[in-house]
C-alpha cells in the first residue's frame, strides 16, 4: 500500500543507505522490483478536477510504500531489514489545467547522491475532466500517467558467483511504469474527496556492475529484466485553504 502526504515535510527524508541483496529468485526479483516501481510511480496527490480555463499549482509530495519483500530479502542477506520495511519517497510537483478541461501533472526528484546510493525520479500525467466539460454535477476524468525512476547503490558482494571473495559492485534498478485510470471527485465547501481506478504496469531492468558476480539464483547474467501488472486504485482527499491545498492519499497498484 502506497501512502502519500502532500506538503508533508516530515516525509521527505529518503534512503539513508542502500540495501544488501543476494541470491534472488525470479519471484523475489519481480516482487522487490515491483515494490520499488510502485513507490516511485506517479502521484500529485490531487483530485482529478479542473478549475477555470487556466491554472497552475506547485508543491511538495512525500510518503512511504510498504515493502515487505525488500525487508525479507535484506534480512536473508544477513543485514538488518527494519530500515526497509517501508520505502520513502519525496519530490517536487507541478500541476496545470488548460481549456477544454485538460490537465497535466509533473513530479520529479532531482538526482540525489549519498556515499553509497544514487536516486532520481521523473513522472508525468495527462488527463481530461469530461464531467466538467459536459457540465455534470461532479468531476469525472480519464487519465494516463508514466514514471521513470533510477535507484542504484553500492554493495560488497560475496557469493559463489564471485568465488566467495569480496567484490565491490553497484546494483541498479531502472524502473518504468504506466497507469491508465478513470476517476471522480466532488467538492463540498473546502473538502474534495476523490477516487481513481484503473490498470498498472511496471518494467524494471536490474543490473549488477562489478568485475564479477551477480545477485540472481536463476541466472549467471549481470543484468535481468522483469515486469509486473495489475489493478490500480486510489482514495484521497484535498483540503483547499485559500491559496494552499493540502492532500492525503492512499493507493494500491499491482498488489503493492
Listing of model-derived features with the role each one plays in the protein:
Residues 100-106, 133-140, 190-193, 241-248:
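Repeated loop/turn-to-beta-strand initiation elements of outer-membrane beta-barrel proteins
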Residues 47, 60, 92-98, 124-128, ...:
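Residues on the lipid-exposed face of transmembrane beta-strands in outer-membrane beta-barrel proteins
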Residues 99-106, 158-165, 214-217, 239-243:
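Flexible, solvent-exposed coil segments and beta strand-coil junctions
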Residues 17-133, 147:
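Transmembrane beta-barrel domains of Gram-negative outer membranes and organellar outer membranes
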Residues 62-66, 108-112, 130, 144-150, ...:
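Transmembrane beta-strands of outer-membrane beta-barrel pores
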Residues 3-13:
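Sec-dependent N-terminal signal peptides
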Residues 69-75, 79-85, 112-117, 146-178, ...:
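Extracellular/periplasm-exposed beta-strand and loop segments of Gram-negative cell-envelope proteins
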Residues 52-54, 85-92, 117-124, 136, ...:
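Residues that define the transmembrane beta-barrel architecture of outer-membrane proteins
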Amino acid at each position: 500500500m502506497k501512502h502519500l502526504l502532500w506538503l508533508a515535510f516530515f516525509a521527505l527524508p529518503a534512503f539513508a543507505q542502500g540495501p544488501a541483496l543476494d541470491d534472488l529468485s525470479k519471484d523475489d526479483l519481480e516482487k522487490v522490483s515491483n515494490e520499488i516501481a510502485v513507490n516511485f510511480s506517479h502521484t500529485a496527490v490531487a483530485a482529478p478536477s479542473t478549475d477555470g480555463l487556466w491554472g497552475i499549482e506547485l508543491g511538495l509530495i512525500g510518503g512511504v510504500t510498504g515493502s515487505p519483500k525488500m525487508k525479507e530479502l535484506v534480512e536473508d542477506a544477513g543485514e538488518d531489514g527494519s530500515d526497509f520495511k517501508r520505502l520513502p519517497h519525496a519530490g517536487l510537483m507541478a500541476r496545470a489545467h488548460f481549456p477544454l478541461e485538460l490537465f497535466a501533472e509533473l513530479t520529479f526528484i532531482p538526482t540525489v547522491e549519498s556515499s553509497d546510493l544514487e536516486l532520481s525520479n521523473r513522472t508525468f500525467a495527462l488527463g481530461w475532466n469530461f464531467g466538467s466539460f459536459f457540465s455534470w454535477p461532479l468531476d469525472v476524468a480519464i487519465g494516463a500517467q508514466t514514471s521513470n525512476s533510477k535507484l542504484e547503490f553500492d554493495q560488497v558482494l560475496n557469493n559463489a558467483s564471485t568465488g566467495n571473495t569480496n567484490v565491490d559492485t553497484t546494483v541498479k534498478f531502472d524502473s518504468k511504469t504506466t497507469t491508465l485510470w478513470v476517476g471522480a471527485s466532488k467538492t463540498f465547501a473546502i473538502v474534495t474527496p476523490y477516487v481513481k481506478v484503473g490498470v498498472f504496469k511496471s518494467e524494471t531492468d536490474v543490473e549488477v556492475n562489478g568485475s564479477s558476480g551477480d545477485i540472481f539464483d536463476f541466472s549467471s547474467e549481470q543484468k535481468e529484466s522483469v515486469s509486473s501488472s495489475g489493478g490500480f486504485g486510489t482514495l484521497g482527499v484535498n483540503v483547499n485553504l485559500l491559496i494552499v491545498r493540502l492532500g492525503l492519499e492512499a493507493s494500491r497498484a499491482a498488489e503493492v
